[in-house]
UniProtKB/Swiss-Prot annotation:
UniProt gene name: MT-CYB
Annotated source species: Pseudantechinus bilarni (Sandstone dibbler)
Miscellaneous comment as given in the Swiss-Prot or TrEMBL entry: Heme 1 (or BL or b562) is low-potential and absorbs at about 562 nm, and heme 2 (or BH or b566) is high-potential and absorbs at about 566 nm.
Task of the protein: Component of the ubiquinol-cytochrome c reductase complex (complex III or cytochrome b-c1 complex) that is part of the mitochondrial respiratory chain. The b-c1 complex mediates electron transfer from ubiquinol to cytochrome c. Contributes to the generation of a proton gradient across the mitochondrial membrane that is then used for ATP synthesis.
InterPro entries reported in the protein's UniProt record: Cyt_b/b6_C, Cyt_b/b6_C_sf, Cyt_b/b6_N, Cytb/b6-like_sf, Cytochrome_b, Cytochrome_b_C_euk/bac, Cytochrome_b_N_euk/bac, Di-haem_cyt_TM
Sequence positions that bind heme b b562: H83, H182
Family stated for the protein in its record: Belongs to the cytochrome b family.
UniProt protein name: Cytochrome b
Binding site for a ubiquinone: H201
Gene3D superfamilies hit by this protein: Cytochrome Bc1 Complex, Chain C (1.20.810.10)
Gene Ontology process terms (BP): mitochondrial electron transport, ubiquinol to cytochrome c
């Protein structure tokens, strides 16, 4: 009998992607995050779909519709908690996935990497518009502050900001269009994720050693399906612990108050996963300069392949680059902490030094470390 999964036009694609896919035999748990991000996306789309059935995108009823979901809808509280904390798990996996890519030199698959950066930006946009929907105090003021940054663009800035708002301030029109964007963007993310996989399967996976693994491949199923299943169990365990025991741990208490344009919260701050970028934005005492630094902090990922100077792909055998990588990690954690602090000393000076170190590490120190390691490995030395 002909094996259907190898001949059927649709099943054949699935077979070549998840079953008979030749995978390197030595990829570690750091390679689990791709599949975990796929699971996160599915969870977010499903919980979001059911939430959208009960949510109303109107300034008068948005806040009360979220309260209604939590109080009156069957398991509505669970859907909302899974969706809100699912976003946190999504970003946790995203940051680890990007970190893995930088550490092991996966960015040298340039097409896959560039699509990945576009995916990251799209997910960030989705999370931002989604945060506005409950129409709490921090939702409203977060939307006001961030969309206001568009006004820094020369000549067209103010017009552009008002066009996005659909008026002269964040209001009903803004909320309605943000809901529309929040609904459509996850499907765009799904399409981009398929393209991301398409480019990945053109080259095959990288591996911890950074050496061409063609001489030693194993089938994806059952080896990596079972490994991904373990990752999935741990992800679900963490998500359920968060959503069931401390669902509001990562949220902002200000969002329990309905949006009030006449009352500004003392400290406006985004969700934890944007704090590193927010700290970079605040570090420059100039509106346009801050916006450019904010953009540069994310878009710098696009030029990382051009800054690769080492003869080895992975950092596995490069201790100096490893040290700088972990300093960069500590620096990002510091930025996340600073982004949530009030604008006063000593946070101001730390918040100005940390972004300088961030750009210095990526643009100067890490490329020079690669060159120095090449020099140290020369046999004549």
């Amino acid at each position: 009998m002909i094996n259907l999964r190898k001949t059927h036009p649709l099943l054949k694609i699935i077979n070549h992607s998840f079953i008979d896919l030749p995978a390197p035999s030595n990829i570690s748990a750091w390679w689990n995050f791709g599949s975990l991000l796929g699971i996160c996306l599915i969870i977010q789309i499903l919980t979001g779909l059911f939430l959208a059935m009960h949510y109303t995108s109107d300034t008068l009823t948005a806040f009360s519709s979220v309260a209604h979901i939590c109080r009156d809808v069957n398991h509505g509280w669970l859907l909302r908690n899974l969706h809100a904390n699912g976003a946190s798990m999504f970003f946790m996996c995203l940051f680890l996935h990007v970190g893995r890519g930088i550490y092991y030199g996966s960015y040298l698959y340039k097409e896959t990497w560039n699509i990945g950066v576009i995916l990251l930006l799209t997910v960030m946009a989705t999370a931002f518009v989604g945060y506005v929907l409950p129409w709490g105090q921090m939702s409203f003021w977060g939307a006001t502050v961030i969309t206001n940054l568009l006004s820094t663009i020369p000549y067209i800035g103010t017009t552009l900001a008002e066009w996005i708002w659909g008026g002269f301030a964040v209001d009903k029109a803004t909320l309605t269009r943000f809901f529309a964007f929040h609904f459509i963007l996850p499907f765009i993310i799904t399409a981009l994720a398929v393209v991301h996989l398409l480019f990945l399967h053109e080259t095959g996976s990288n591996n911890p050693s950074g050496i061409n693994p063609d001489s030693d491949k194993i089938p994806f199923h059952p080896y990596y399906t079972i490994k991904d299943a373990l990752g999935l169990m741990l992800l679900l365990l963490m998500l359920l612990l968060l959503a069931l025991f401390s669902p509001d741990l990562l949220g902002d208490p200000d969002n329990f108050s309905p949006a009030n344009p006449l009352n500004t919260p003392p400290h406006i701050k985004p969700e934890w996963y944007f704090l590193f970028a927010y700290a970079i934005l605040r570090s420059i005492p100039n509106k346009l300069g801050g916006v450019l630094a904010l953009l540069a902090s994310i878009l710098i990922l696009l030029i990382i392949p051009l800054l690769h100077t080492a003869n080895q792909r992975s950092m596995m055998f490069r201790p100096i680059s490893q040290t700088l990588f972990w300093i960069l990690t500590a620096n990002l954690i510091t930025l996340t902490w600073i982004g949530g602090q009030p604008v006063e000393q000593p946070f101001i000076i730390i918040g100005q030094l940390a972004p300088m170190l961030y750009f210095l590490l990526i643009l100067v120190l890490m490329p020079f470390a690669g060159l120095f390691e090449n020099y140290m490995l020369e046999p004549e030395w």
